[in-house]
C-alpha cells in the first residue's frame, strides 16, 4: 500500500506560530550549555531542554540551533543538558525542577525511566512539552504537546522504497538500546518488507558500527539493502559496503552535511527527514507561548515534523539548509 503522511496538523501549527510571533512584535558524559536570547526582548523566562544526545552526534546540533533561535526570538534563557543514559537524563530533569525553571522540553526516549520524573515537574506546576522520541507516551507523561516525526510511518516508507528497488533482504541497524523511536523505525521497515533483520550496533563508536555491518555483509550475501537509523551510521554503512566489496544500497533516517552530500553523490539512496531544527524551535516556542498566553500548539495533539524523503530528486533544494544547520 502507498504510505501518505497527514501534515495538516503540523501546517496549522506552524501557521498559528507565525501569527503568534507577529503578535509578540548521551553512552557518554552529561552535556550542559546555557544561552540567553536577545532578539525578542527579555521575557524573563528560563527554559530547560533535556535530551538523550550521544556526545559527538551532530544530529542534535540542529535541535539546539532551533531551540536557541526560539530563545533568541522570545528573549528567553535556554539551559540545555543531555545524557544518553535514561537514568541520568531523569536526574537532569529533576535538576531542572529543583532550579525552578519556567518550563521543560524533553525527549522521552525511554518512557518508563523518564515519565515518573516528568510527572514530578507537572505536579510542581512546571509546564512540560516533549519532542523527538516518545510520541506514544507524551500524554501519559503529562506533556502539553509532542513535536516529532511518525517513526513507524517513516520505516514503512523506507521498506516500500527498498522493496520497489528490488530488495531481497534488508539489514536494519539500531544504535541505541531501549529507544522506542529507533525500534519503531525498524518495525515499520519490517512491516512493509518482512525479510528484514535487525542488528544492534554501538552508536557511540563509528569504527565498531562499520566493523559490525561489514561482518554481517560478509556472513550473509543475500543482504542487498541497509537501512540505518542515523546519519552517522549511514556513513559508517557506506564504508562497510566498500570494505566488504558488496553490491548493497543504503537508506538512512536523519542527516548531516556529509550524509546529505552522500545522497547527492549517489552513495546513499535517501534520507528520511524529521526536521530536527523545527522540533527544537517549536519545543521552546510552545513553552513561551504557554507561559505568555496559555497557547497549546496543535491543541495538545502530536504535531508531526516528518517523515519526508530526501533523495536525488530534491537534495539540491535541501542541501543548502542542511549545511546552514537549519534542516
Indicate residue ranges for each PLM-predicted region.
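C-terminal motif of bacterial Sec signal peptides marking the signal peptidase cleavage site
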Residues: 19-23
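Bacterial signal peptide processing site
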Residues: 25-28
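Extracytoplasmic "Venus flytrap"
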Residues: 41-70, 74, 78-90, 108-111, ...
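Hinge/cleft segment of the Venus flytrap/periplasmic-binding protein
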Residues: 43, 192-193, 282-327
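Short, solvent-exposed amphipathic alpha-helices that sit
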Residues: 58-73, 154-158, 177-198, 212, ...
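Hydrophobic alpha-helical segments within soluble ligand-binding/sensing domains
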Residues: 89, 145-170, 208-210, 256-259, ...
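Hydrophobic alpha-helical
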Residues: 90, 106-122, 189, 203-261
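Flexible loop/hinge segments that line or gate small-molecule binding clefts
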Residues: 112, 116-153, 167, 256-264, ...
Amino acid at each position: 500500500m502507498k504510505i501518505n503522511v497527514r501534515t495538516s496538523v503540523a501546517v496549522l501549527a506552524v501557521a498559528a506560530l507565525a501569527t503568534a510571533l507577529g503578535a509578540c512584535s548521551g553512552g557518554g558524559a552529561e552535556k550542559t550549555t546555557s544561552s540567553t536570547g536577545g532578539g525578542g526582548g527579555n521575557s524573563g523566562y528560563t527554559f530547560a531542554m533535556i535530551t538523550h544526545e550521544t556526545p559527538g552526534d551532530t544530529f542534535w546540533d540542529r535541535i539546539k540551533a532551533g531551540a536557541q533561535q526560539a530563545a533568541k526570538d522570545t528573549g528567553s534563557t535556554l539551559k540545555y543538558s543531555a545524557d544518553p543514559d535514561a537514568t541520568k537524563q531523569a536526574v537532569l530533569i529533576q535538576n531542572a525542577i529543583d532550579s525552578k525553571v519556567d518550563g521543560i522540553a524533553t525527549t522521552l526516549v525511554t518512557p518508563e525511566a523518564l515519565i515518573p520524573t516528568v510527572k514530578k515537574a507537572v505536579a510542581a506546576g512546571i509546564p512540560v512539552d516533549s519532542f523527538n522520541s516518545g510520541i506514544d507516551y507524551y500524554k501519559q507523561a503529562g506533556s502539553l504537546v509532542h513535536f516529532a516525526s511518525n517513526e513507524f510511518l517513516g520505516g514503512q516508507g523506507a521498506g516500500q522504497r527498498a522493496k520497489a528497488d528490488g530488495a531481497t533482504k534488508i539489514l536494519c541497524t539500531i544504535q541505541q538500546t531501549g529507544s522506542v523511536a529507533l525500534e519503531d523505525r525498524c518495525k515499520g521497515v519490517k512491516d512493509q518488507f518482512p525479510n528484514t533483520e535487525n542488528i544492534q550496533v554501538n552508536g557511540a563508536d563509528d569504527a565498531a558500527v562499520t566493523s559490525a555491518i561489514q561482518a554481517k555483509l560478509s556472513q550473509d550475501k543475500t543482504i542487498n539493502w541497509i537501512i540505518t537509523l542515523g546519519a552517522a551510521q549511514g556513513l559508517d554503512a557506506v564504508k562497510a559496503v566498500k570494505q566488504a566489496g558488496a553490491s548493497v544500497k543504503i537508506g538512512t533516517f536523519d542527516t548531516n552535511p556529509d550524509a546529505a552530500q552522500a545522497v547527492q553523490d549517489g552513495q546513499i539512496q535517501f534520507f528520511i527527514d524529521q526536521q530536527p531544527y523545527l522540533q527544537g524551535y517549536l519545543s521552546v516556542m510552545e513553552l513561551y507561548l504557554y507561559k505568555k498566553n496559555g497557547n497549546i500548539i496543535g491543541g495538545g495533539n502530536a504535531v508531526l515534523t516528518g517523515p519526508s524523503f530526501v533523495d536525488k530528486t530534491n537534495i539540491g533544494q535541501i542541501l543548502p539548509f542542511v549545511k546552514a544547520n537549519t534542516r
